[in-house]
């Protein structure tokens, strides 16, 4: 069978604070090192403004009910305000700088890796479907020890759509040949994961305390 996992707060505990000054000081430094007269407070304000503006445009286009933005574009927008420019690599780098400075907690839940291994030995295929930014999430998956855990994954920033939009689920199904009749979604969020799975026509496990805390229920799926 195919089991689809969310990542953040399902397999790994994460807590980030984008409002504290320590988050934006290294971002200011990043721009200044490239000749742009940025200030941490101004960059933080621009980040929020440009994010909302770009997301509003995506919503107006109407392609998806729940569109997703590639956040690296926001950092390119910010550079233009200061008369500069960032290429794709630099935009991803400054996003990782901001993210790294914002992280308070990032760790795999105890027992999560063991759960995935048990599912694998029982013949399950494992997939990841996450509302996440590719610029930093793939690195965080590696840091938490899950780099080789999945048969495939999709991140919302790479697809332009996010959970609970059923189209995001269907993209995963189509790319990896997942059978929606037997697939199960495991996630901590009732709306995005459980509600999204229902909209896509698949079963789900609401792992509100993380997947490892619901290991018995998840493992039981492979016995049916």
For each of these PLM feature ranges, what is it?
Residues 1-110:
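N-terminal helical cap/lid subdomain that shapes the substrate entry/recognition surface
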Residues 1-5, 13-17, 32-41, 89-91, ...:
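Asp-based, Mg2+/Mn2+-dependent phosphohydrolase catalytic module
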